[in-house]
């Protein structure tokens, strides 16, 4: 069953959180949901070169908060924050409430399934050999600390007349284990021969303490341990030597 269901959907509430956090009346639910889809499509088209992974949308009372996870925060922010201010004004018009945009930097893009899939898709569109693109992405992810990764391509691979599916995997990807931190993404590559589907699974380890340990990690205690009073080992050795000399 774990191989058929969406890897992120089955882990919601266990080790994964929703990409939207808001409550609405039954009459407004469909309106908010459609607005979320429009906002996500708008941001991905406008910031297509910013390497965006996730877009978190929150709706507190009378406002909206949008958190963009990107590997290139400088492109989103712009010079002196000019681009992000324009973005906030446009999103305010779209959502009908004051919108606040926050940027979250992705420090390890090779461990993000969305960014890995988009990288493979861009290589396929530039006519790079599909096996080379798959192996390069897998090697980079394993080198960055992934415990397992699987890449699957479907379509007219290499310009073949008959479409087929090929996949490549390294490490382990336990789809049935709910505590496994597995990131998943599917992207389409528009090539001259047609559309090629790219699917990526990245296994980043197991989460034993639940999703709170991922989204709210405990702060490190920087207080120093109190120093012990008393003589050090060197002083004890010197005193022992003095006693033996006296004896």
UniProtKB/Swiss-Prot annotation:
Q: Where is this region: Disordered?
A: 213-247
Q: How does it assemble?
A: Part of the 30S ribosomal subunit. Forms a tight complex with proteins S10 and S14.
Where in the sequence does UniProt note compositional bias of the Basic and acidic residues kind?
237-247
The protein in question is named: Small ribosomal subunit protein uS3
Q: Which UniProt keywords apply?
A: Ribonucleoprotein, Ribosomal protein, RNA-binding, rRNA-binding
Q: What does the protein in this record do?
A: Binds the lower part of the 30S subunit head. Binds mRNA in the 70S ribosome, positioning it for translation.
Q: Which NCBIfam families match?
A: rpsC_bact (TIGR01009)
Q: Which family does it belong to?
A: Belongs to the universal ribosomal protein uS3 family.
- Read off the CDD domains from this record: KH-II_30S_S3 (cd02412)
The record's section on InterPro entries has: KH_dom, KH_dom-like_a/b, KH_dom_type_2, KH_sf_prok-type, Ribosomal_S3_C_sf, Ribosomal_uS3_bac-typ, Ribosomal_uS3_C, Ribosomal_uS3_CS
Provide the gene name from the record. rpsC
- Specify the species: Psychrobacter sp. (strain PRwf-1)
């Amino acid at each position: 069953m774990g191989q058929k269901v969406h890897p992120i959907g089955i882990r919601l509430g266990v080790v994964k959180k929703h990409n939207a956090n808001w409550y609405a009346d039954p009459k407004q639910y469909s309106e908010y949901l459609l607005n979320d889809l429009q906002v996500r499509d708008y941001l991905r088209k406008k910031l297509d070169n910013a390497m965006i992974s996730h877009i978190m949308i929150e709706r507190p009372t009378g406002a909206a908060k949008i958190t963009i996870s990107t590997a290139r925060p400088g492109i989103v922010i712009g010079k002196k924050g000019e681009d992000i201010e324009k973005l906030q004004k446009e999103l305010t018009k779209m959502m009908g409430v004051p919108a606040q945009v926050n940027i979250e930097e992705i420090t390890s893009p090779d461990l993000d399934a969305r960014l890995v899939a988009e990288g493979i898709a861009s290589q396929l569109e530039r006519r790079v050999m599909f096996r080379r693109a798959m192996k390069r992405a897998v090697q980079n992810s394993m080198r960055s600390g992934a415990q397992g990764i699987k890449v699957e391509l479907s379509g007219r691979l290499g310009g073949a007349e008959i479409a087929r599916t090929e996949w490549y995997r390294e490490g382990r990807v336990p789809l049935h284990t709910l505590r496994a931190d597995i990131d998943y993404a599917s992207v389409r590559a528009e090539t001259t021969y047609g559309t090629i589907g790219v699917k990526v699974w990245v296994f980043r380890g197991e989460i034993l303490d639940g999703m709170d340990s991922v989204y709210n990690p405990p702060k490190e205690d920087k207080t120093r341990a109190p120093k012990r009073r008393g003589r050090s080992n060197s002083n004890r050795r010197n005193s022992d030597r003095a006693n033996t000399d006296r004896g």
